[in-house]
Amino acid sequence: MSGVKFNIGKIVNTHGIRGEVKVVRITDFEDRFDPGNTVYLQDNKEYKPLVIATHRVHKGFDLLQFKGYGNINEVEAFKGLMLSIDEDQLTDLEEDAYYYHEIVGCKVVTSEGEELGKVKEILSPGANDVWVVQRMNAKDLLIPYIEQVVKQVDIENKIIKVQLMEGMLD
């Protein structure tokens, strides 16, 4: 187990009396919640390993039950806490796909070499992700993650080259 953890969901409530918790998922990989998988409950600075016993989706939420926790009273204290996975549980992505933590913090430059700022967050409003670039002395710039705009992503050097469309800086 490495020391680096990645958040995959937040427990927002309990569900029923048999120890299920309601989770808002913040991962694209539903299989992170497969029964038998280990996730980590972040409580203060401690990470407590929990093994998933059951998983189902109900009204847009992931409902999880953990092995050894069969009663609402045992999971009540989990409300509001984050679920994480270990770095070695990350899976390889296909080409031109990146984990958010790889993109956030990257410097964004135009094809001409003009520095625009750094990616501070990623939005997922619909068909494609939108990278929010924090600029110096200017309002944030929204960069759609599409081929026409994002030309090169260099994760190793944390640099993203873009070709801005007309009106993007307005």
UniProtKB/Swiss-Prot annotation:
Keywords attached to this entry: Chaperone, Cytoplasm, Ribosome biogenesis, rRNA processing
Cross-referenced HAMAP family: Ribosome_mat_RimM
Protein name per its UniProtKB record: Ribosome maturation factor RimM
Domain PRC barrel residue range list: 95-168
Self-association state and partner proteins as the record states: Binds ribosomal protein uS19.
Gene Ontology CC, one term: ribosome
GO molecular function: ribosome binding
Domain free text: The PRC barrel domain binds ribosomal protein uS19.
Gene name in the database record: rimM
Organism: Oceanobacillus iheyensis (strain DSM 14371 / CIP 107618 / JCM 11309 / KCTC 3954 / HTE831)
Subcellular location per the Swiss-Prot or TrEMBL entry: Cytoplasm
NCBIfam families xrefs: 16S_RimM
One GO term of the biological process aspect: rRNA processing
Family statement: Belongs to the RimM family.
Upper lineage: Bacteria, Bacillati, Bacillota, Bacilli, Bacillales
Keyword rRNA processing recorded: yes
Role of this protein: An accessory protein needed during the final step in the assembly of 30S ribosomal subunit, possibly for assembly of the head region. Essential for efficient processing of 16S rRNA. May be needed both before and after RbfA during the maturation of 16S rRNA. It has affinity for free ribosomal 30S subunits but not for 70S ribosomes.
